[in-house]
Amino acid sequence: PSKSIKVCQNRTFEKALFTKLGIPTPKYHIVDSADSLESAVKDLGCPVVVKTTTEGYDGKGQFVIQTEDQCPTAWSTIGNRELIVESFVNFKRELSIIAVRKENDDMAVYPMAENDHLNGILRFSTAPATNISEEINNLANTYIKELMHELGHVGILTLELFETDDGLTANEMAPRVHNSGHWSIEGTACSQF
């Protein structure tokens, strides 16, 4: 598979790429046993979000640990495989930015969307997102462009971000058209499709 698909299919690779490029992420640990899960939770402090490193989507393969005594339940529910344990992010809102790149390096970036979820499922996106500071907009544009270049990505790429009091924190990315960009069908002259 392409480098983009390989990275996006594994949260361990994805977080490593974000870190390499200086894109902030939640603090995290990779674990592969019930004991290492408990150690990670103790180190990070509760609450944490535990996710499968592969095959998770729309809230599937995730468990929020509120207290340390929930570790065995989390492990029995989604464990017995490699997991990523992330510090819980107190965010103001989730944003996504979508960019498309040609082989000759021409690139277009769509306006950011604000995403509203219910039970881990995107319910609607508002685009363009309102009240985006110039600093936040510039950061998001820089991050998506750096990812495109580092991956040598040709096509469309979406980056999901949490806006916090400290700026932006990367959640995940997708090397495909994205549900947060469906607004572009009627909302732009050239949709993400």
Label for each model-derived stretch:
Residues 1-44, 55-56:
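Conserved N-proximal alpha/beta basic substrate-recognition cap immediately N-terminal to
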Residues 17-23, 51-59, 118-128:
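Acidic/polar active-site rim loop that often engages polyanionic ligands
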Residues 44-45, 164-169:
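A short, glycine/Asx- and small/polar-enriched loop/turn
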Residues 65-159, 163-165:
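Internal nucleotide-binding/catalytic subdomain
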Residues 99, 167-176:
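A short beta-strand motif that forms the metal-chelation/ATP-contact edge
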Residues 113-116, 173-177:
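Short beta->alpha transition motifs characteristic of CBS
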Residues 174-189:
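Glycine-rich phosphate/pyrophosphate-binding beta-alpha loops
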Residues 191-193:
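Internal helical hairpin/lid segments
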